[in-house]
Protein backbone atom coordinates (compact mmCIF):
# COMPACT_ATOMS: atom_id res chain seq x y z
CA UNK A 1 0.00 0.00 0.00
CA UNK A 2 1.13 3.49 -0.74
CA UNK A 3 1.72 6.02 1.99
CA UNK A 4 -1.06 8.27 0.64
CA UNK A 5 -3.57 5.40 0.83
CA UNK A 6 -2.60 4.70 4.45
CA UNK A 7 -3.06 8.37 5.31
CA UNK A 8 -6.53 8.35 3.69
CA UNK A 9 -7.51 5.21 5.61
CA UNK A 10 -6.27 6.73 8.88
CA UNK A 11 -8.20 9.97 8.24
CA UNK A 12 -11.38 8.05 7.38
CA UNK A 13 -11.01 5.94 10.54
CA UNK A 14 -10.53 9.02 12.74
CA UNK A 15 -13.47 10.76 11.10
CA UNK A 16 -15.62 7.69 11.77
CA UNK A 17 -14.54 7.64 15.41
CA UNK A 18 -15.32 11.35 15.83
CA UNK A 19 -18.79 10.94 14.26
CA UNK A 20 -19.50 7.94 16.51
CA UNK A 21 -18.43 9.88 19.62
CA UNK A 22 -20.64 12.85 18.71
CA UNK A 23 -23.63 10.52 18.21
CA UNK A 24 -22.99 8.76 21.52
CA UNK A 25 -22.60 12.04 23.41
CA UNK A 26 -25.82 13.40 21.88
CA UNK A 27 -27.67 10.25 22.93
CA UNK A 28 -26.31 10.44 26.48
CA UNK A 29 -27.20 14.13 26.72
CA UNK A 30 -30.78 13.43 25.52
CA UNK A 31 -31.21 10.75 28.20
CA UNK A 32 -29.67 12.77 31.05
CA UNK A 33 -31.88 13.23 34.12
CA UNK A 34 -33.65 16.57 34.17
CA UNK A 35 -35.40 18.53 36.92
CA UNK A 36 -37.87 21.28 36.07
CA UNK A 37 -39.67 23.67 38.39
CA UNK A 38 -42.77 25.72 37.68
CA UNK A 39 -45.76 27.39 39.28
CA UNK A 40 -49.15 25.71 38.88
CA UNK A 41 -52.08 28.13 38.96
CA UNK A 42 -55.79 27.59 38.74
CA UNK A 43 -58.72 29.98 38.90
CA UNK A 44 -62.32 28.83 39.38
CA UNK A 45 -65.47 30.34 37.89
CA UNK A 46 -66.02 32.59 40.92
CA UNK A 47 -62.53 34.10 40.53
CA UNK A 48 -60.80 32.38 43.46
CA UNK A 49 -57.27 31.35 42.55
CA UNK A 50 -54.59 29.07 43.92
CA UNK A 51 -50.89 28.74 43.04
CA UNK A 52 -48.47 26.04 44.19
CA UNK A 53 -44.93 25.05 43.22
CA UNK A 54 -44.43 22.04 40.92
CA UNK A 55 -41.27 19.99 40.44
CA UNK A 56 -40.92 17.45 37.64
CA UNK A 57 -37.91 15.18 38.04
CA UNK A 58 -37.35 13.13 34.89
CA UNK A 59 -34.93 10.20 35.11
CA UNK A 60 -35.44 8.75 31.63
CA UNK A 61 -37.19 9.60 28.39
CA UNK A 62 -39.26 7.19 26.30
CA UNK A 63 -38.03 5.93 22.95
CA UNK A 64 -40.06 6.27 19.75
CA UNK A 65 -40.96 2.57 20.09
CA UNK A 66 -42.34 3.19 23.61
CA UNK A 67 -44.30 6.17 22.28
CA UNK A 68 -45.77 4.02 19.49
CA UNK A 69 -46.72 1.30 22.01
CA UNK A 70 -48.55 3.84 24.19
CA UNK A 71 -50.43 5.29 21.20
CA UNK A 72 -51.42 1.76 20.11
CA UNK A 73 -52.71 1.02 23.62
CA UNK A 74 -54.81 4.21 23.64
CA UNK A 75 -56.22 3.39 20.18
CA UNK A 76 -57.07 -0.15 21.25
CA UNK A 77 -58.53 0.41 24.70
CA UNK A 78 -58.45 4.07 25.70
CA UNK A 79 -57.52 5.13 29.21
CA UNK A 80 -57.75 1.66 30.76
CA UNK A 81 -55.35 0.12 28.23
CA UNK A 82 -52.93 3.03 28.53
CA UNK A 83 -52.95 2.75 32.31
CA UNK A 84 -52.29 -1.02 32.19
CA UNK A 85 -49.31 -0.49 29.89
CA UNK A 86 -47.91 2.35 32.00
CA UNK A 87 -48.27 0.46 35.28
CA UNK A 88 -46.10 -2.37 33.91
CA UNK A 89 -43.25 -0.01 32.99
CA UNK A 90 -40.49 1.42 35.12
CA UNK A 91 -40.85 4.87 36.65
CA UNK A 92 -39.51 7.70 34.48
CA UNK A 93 -39.35 10.20 37.35
CA UNK A 94 -41.85 12.02 39.55
CA UNK A 95 -44.12 15.05 39.70
CA UNK A 96 -44.26 16.86 43.01
CA UNK A 97 -47.19 19.23 43.44
CA UNK A 98 -47.06 20.88 46.83
CA UNK A 99 -46.42 17.96 49.19
CA UNK A 100 -47.92 15.26 46.93
CA UNK A 101 -45.52 13.17 44.82
CA UNK A 102 -46.70 11.00 41.89
CA UNK A 103 -44.58 8.68 39.74
CA UNK A 104 -44.10 9.63 36.09
CA UNK A 105 -44.48 6.49 34.00
CA UNK A 106 -43.90 8.07 30.58
CA UNK A 107 -41.78 11.06 29.57
CA UNK A 108 -41.33 11.95 25.92
CA UNK A 109 -39.33 14.87 24.51
CA UNK A 110 -39.78 16.30 21.04
CA UNK A 111 -37.51 18.99 19.60
CA UNK A 112 -39.25 21.99 18.06
CA UNK A 113 -37.80 24.76 15.91
CA UNK A 114 -35.19 27.08 17.38
CA UNK A 115 -34.08 24.62 20.05
CA UNK A 116 -37.40 24.65 21.92
CA UNK A 117 -38.72 21.32 23.23
CA UNK A 118 -42.14 19.87 23.95
CA UNK A 119 -42.30 17.41 26.85
CA UNK A 120 -45.19 15.06 27.50
CA UNK A 121 -45.32 13.49 30.97
CA UNK A 122 -47.91 10.88 31.94
CA UNK A 123 -48.69 9.29 35.31
CA UNK A 124 -50.53 5.97 35.71
CA UNK A 125 -52.73 7.47 38.40
CA UNK A 126 -54.32 10.88 38.91
CA UNK A 127 -52.06 13.56 40.37
CA UNK A 128 -55.12 14.88 42.25
CA UNK A 129 -58.82 15.53 41.67
CA UNK A 130 -59.60 19.20 41.13
CA UNK A 131 -63.25 20.14 41.21
CA UNK A 132 -66.49 19.33 42.91
CA UNK A 133 -65.92 22.42 45.06
CA UNK A 134 -63.76 20.61 47.61
CA UNK A 135 -60.01 20.42 48.24
CA UNK A 136 -60.21 16.61 48.49
CA UNK A 137 -62.56 15.98 45.57
CA UNK A 138 -63.45 12.32 45.11
CA UNK A 139 -62.37 10.14 42.17
CA UNK A 140 -64.67 9.52 39.21
CA UNK A 141 -64.47 6.31 37.20
CA UNK A 142 -62.17 6.43 34.20
CA UNK A 143 -60.18 9.54 35.10
CA UNK A 144 -57.13 7.41 35.79
CA UNK A 145 -54.16 9.28 34.31
CA UNK A 146 -52.33 12.53 34.98
CA UNK A 147 -50.89 14.52 32.06
CA UNK A 148 -48.36 17.33 31.88
CA UNK A 149 -47.49 19.17 28.66
CA UNK A 150 -44.49 21.48 28.85
CA UNK A 151 -43.15 23.84 26.21
CA UNK A 152 -39.53 24.51 27.11
CA UNK A 153 -37.86 27.50 25.52
CA UNK A 154 -34.24 27.45 24.35
CA UNK A 155 -33.84 30.69 26.29
CA UNK A 156 -36.13 31.98 29.00
CA UNK A 157 -38.89 30.32 30.99
CA UNK A 158 -41.38 27.95 29.41
CA UNK A 159 -45.05 27.26 30.00
CA UNK A 160 -47.41 24.33 30.10
CA UNK A 161 -50.60 22.70 31.27
CA UNK A 162 -51.38 20.10 33.91
CA UNK A 163 -54.37 17.80 33.57
CA UNK A 164 -54.32 16.21 37.03
CA UNK A 165 -56.99 13.56 36.31
CA UNK A 166 -57.84 12.64 32.74
CA UNK A 167 -59.39 10.21 30.30
CA UNK A 168 -57.74 9.73 26.90
CA UNK A 169 -58.90 8.49 23.51
CA UNK A 170 -57.94 8.75 19.85
CA UNK A 171 -60.16 10.73 17.46
CA UNK A 172 -60.87 10.14 13.75
CA UNK A 173 -57.69 12.03 12.79
CA UNK A 174 -55.54 9.78 15.06
CA UNK A 175 -54.95 12.62 17.51
CA UNK A 176 -54.95 12.00 21.26
CA UNK A 177 -57.91 13.72 22.91
CA UNK A 178 -58.02 14.32 26.67
CA UNK A 179 -61.04 14.78 28.89
CA UNK A 180 -60.28 16.60 32.14
CA UNK A 181 -61.97 15.64 35.43
CA UNK A 182 -62.22 19.28 36.46
CA UNK A 183 -63.68 22.28 34.69
CA UNK A 184 -60.73 24.53 35.54
CA UNK A 185 -57.49 24.50 33.54
CA UNK A 186 -54.26 24.24 35.55
CA UNK A 187 -51.67 26.50 33.92
CA UNK A 188 -47.94 26.02 34.44
CA UNK A 189 -45.84 29.16 34.24
CA UNK A 190 -42.19 30.07 34.71
CA UNK A 191 -41.04 26.54 33.76
CA UNK A 192 -37.25 26.39 34.14
CA UNK A 193 -34.51 23.81 34.62
CA UNK A 194 -33.35 23.49 38.19
Protein language model annotation of sequence segments:
Residues 1-11:
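N-terminal secretory signal peptides that target proteins for export/translocation
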Residues 8, 22, 69-70:
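A residue-level detector for conformationally permissive "hinge/kink" positions
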Residues 12-24:
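Bacterial N-terminal signal peptides
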Residues 32-76, 80-194:
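Long, low-hydrophobicity ectodomains and other hydrophilic envelope-associated domains
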Amino acid sequence: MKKSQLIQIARATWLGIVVLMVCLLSSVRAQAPETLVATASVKNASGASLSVPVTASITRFASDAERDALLAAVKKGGTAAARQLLEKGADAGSIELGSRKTAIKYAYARTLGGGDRLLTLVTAQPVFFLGAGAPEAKPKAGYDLGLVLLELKASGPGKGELVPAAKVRVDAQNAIVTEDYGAEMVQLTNVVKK
